[in-house]
Each structure stands twice: as structure tokens, then as C-alpha cells.
Amino acid sequence: MTPPAPAASSVPPETGARQQRVAVYGICEEGTGKDGRVLLVRAAPHLTVAGQWFLPGGGLDHGEDPVDGLRREFREETGLAITVGPLLGILSDVFTLPDGASLHTLRIVYAVDGHSGELRDEVDGSSDIARWVPLDQALDLPLRPYVLRALTELRGD
């Protein structure tokens, strides 16, 4: 007897190295309407995405709770202590790295309900500038694709 054909899959065929990354990000806003601002950080010059803007956050350490990871990333990238709000969603993307490897990233996105401390830029890290950006200007910046999705699909208005 011939075994049944495998079911169709949305996963691309394996042709090279495959990597997976789990990361956590926060949408931190101040004000409302035309006075609303969102906190963004800019990718540092040593990164391949230098100059692009992203939400504060980043990769989780092995075994790290996403809420703890988000608090850590905000301290590192902005100097702020945060109160993590509700989960807004999980974004998934797959793209090919310059070396040909396929990278699948799961991005856990939370609302940030509050913050304290003084905003500062990260030194010698993955970002070089942390800024409050008016919402109406944020979409005109060179944003990482997931940031555009997070700001337009996940945040409530």
C-alpha cells in the first residue's frame, strides 16, 4: 500500500540553514490624538539595519519570561523602567539573511502602560538614539517592517 501524500504546508522547503528568534517589544505612548507620541529607538551604525527605527525591545534570553525581557530591554535601550500592559499580538515573519540562511522571527508585542526614569540613549548597544516621536511623523521614518505593522495593526485608537 502506498502511504498518503504529505499535507501541503506554508513552510518553505528546507534549502539552507534555518534559524528562529523569539523577541519582545513594547508600544509606549504618551498623549492622545495629534499630541500623541510613541517611543522609538534607532538602530546603531554597526548593524546591517543602521538608521532604521524600531520599537524598544529585542531578543529573549533562553528561559527568560517575555515580560521580564521587555523590562530588561527597555532599561538597556531607553533607561526607563516600565509597567508592562496587555499583550497586543504576536507578529511572525520569515526572511533570508545575507548568508542565505532563513530566519523566522516571532515578535511578542505588549502595550506599555507606564514608565518612570529619565530617557537616555543606549551606549555601545543595538540602538544609538531613543526618542519620543509624534505619531503623525513616526510613519514617515525609515521603520523596520514589523514596526509599521505593529503601529498600524496592533495599537488601539
Model-derived regions: residue spans:
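Conserved Nudix-box catalytic region and its N-terminal flanking loop in Nudix hydrolases
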Residues: 36-76
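A short coil-to-beta-strand element that immediately follows conserved catalytic motifs
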Residues: 81-90
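A generic structural micro-feature
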Residues: 16-20, 52, 100-106, 124-127
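Short, solvent-exposed loop/turn segments that connect beta-strands within catalytic domains
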Residues: 31-36, 48-50, 99-102
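Active-site-adjacent beta-strand/loop module that shapes the phosphate/pyrophosphate-binding cleft
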Residues: 91-119
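Acidic, metal-coordinating catalytic segment for phosphate/diphosphate chemistry
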Residues: 1-25, 31-32
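Conserved hydrophobic "DFG−1" position in protein kinase catalytic cores
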Residues: 28-29, 40, 112-114, 132
